[in-house]
């Protein structure tokens, strides 16, 4: 007795089609997700790149109407203007003299603090040599001590150096937030578009930008062939 198997191929075809459609659906979903993620990453990276550069501010133009109004008010006041101006000048001169006195006092305070705080700039080698020579009747032979003191003052950190180091770390963190594949865009804005930076790049970061730009513009490849 022969059993009909005509339904079996139909089931297999239906299963194959369903399985294929399911695969396509998953693949399309994955591609869509990756595309949207890349768009988000691109827009976020563009914002990070723009944050490196200064934004040009529009020029402020003085209004002529304001000038006319100010002139009219001056003419309406008449004789009272001179007295007002005299009072202003008097107040300003008093404030100026007070400011000068404050500046003078501050400069004296700074000079005194510099004298009390020894650093590489105010370290006087000649005075130090005289002081050391007076401590002994023997011929002076402590130049090495002066040299070590100068070296110690030269290598000790200052407020300015610490501030510069902190600024460098902050700039490095900002730059590292940009993906490496976007360095060529930074090069284009910096070199081609001639946009000024908000803050200077660290040397290592600047070299990475130049390398990416030269690779993109084939400067490295042309240089290897002896071409400009």
Curated annotation (Swiss-Prot):
Biased composition (Low complexity): 96-113
Keyword Nucleus recorded: no
Span list, region Disordered: 90-115
Principal place of residence: cytoplasm
Superkingdom of the source species: Eukaryota
Coiled coil: none
Entry GO terms, CC: cell cortex
Annotated signal peptide: none
Key words of the record: Cytoplasm
Localization (cell): Cytoplasm, Cell cortex
Any Pfam family the entry gives: Lock_Gag1-like
Additional facts recorded: Present with 3140 molecules/cell in log phase SD medium.
Protein known as: Uncharacterized protein YLR407W
Organism: Saccharomyces cerevisiae (strain ATCC 204508 / S288c) (Baker's yeast)
